[in-house]
Amino acid sequence: MRVTNTSMSRIMMDSMANRTVEYAKLNEQLTSGKRVNKISDDPVASMQLVQLENSKSDVNQYKTNVVRLSGNYSVQEASLKSLEGQLLVVRDKLLAAKNGNHSATESATFGREINLLLDGMMSDLNTKNSEGNYLFAGTKTNIEPVEYNKTTQIYTFKGNNERRDAVVGNGITLQENTDLSSSLSASGNNLEILTNLKKLANKMIDSSIKPAAYNQEISDNLAAIEIGAKKIGGMLTDLGAKQNRLEHLSNLHDDVEVVNANLEKDLAGIDILQVNSAMQSNFLSTKIAHSMQAKISQLSLFNYI
């Protein structure tokens, strides 16, 4: 079969066009650092990369949640330790008031000191996180959970004991909040321990009331304090366990990120030296093709005589 100059020219032009497309593809790979830049480059790898991107996005969100939750736990832990410490100081004040023959003035001093400590405990119960949300209000994070009514001398809990959960891993959630108010309540979240301490402190301040009149109340409050302190201690232990869990999850997410990065490299990564070599080979082939095309276009019938 005779191949005409026109056919040969068309073949050469198609070959150069293909080389140009291939060169552009190689250049795009070199620029992006990726072998797969669009679905047509490798449909199977493209689908795997989409799934990988979803995995990376999930891991990033998990890591963000872990950091935020760990910060919240740290603030909660500090508040619990402060509350526990002040509660134990109140216990010491009551023990001192109960075990000695104190004057009305001395008892009043104990009462005022206890009131100051109660103010500090109320502040701990109304702790906010860095986002401005109340940590110990259950799901009512925008409402100050603890209020005190001076007229009735009663502490009231305005939050709830519902849990807030954070997703920190694939199918893994951890409770964000601590039901701290229950540690100072005889039942539910009535804050009875705080209320009874407040009423006792006010009696101690009132010089018209003899210490013997509230001696039994001191004993009752001491027993309640021991129960409350024990509950807070349990909550601190629970927070410590949660922090350890978060640390483990954080390390796990770091490992998954490394695995994802290696998978992405295997699926879409390039060998720069190999791509450069292919581009040079493509360039030389195209240059030779141009030269041949130029010579073919100059041929005439006289070249065949």
Functional labels for PLM-detected ranges:
Residues 140-210:
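Cysteine-poor, low-complexity segments in flexible/peripheral regions
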Residues 1-141, 202-305:
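Amphipathic alpha-helical polymerization modules
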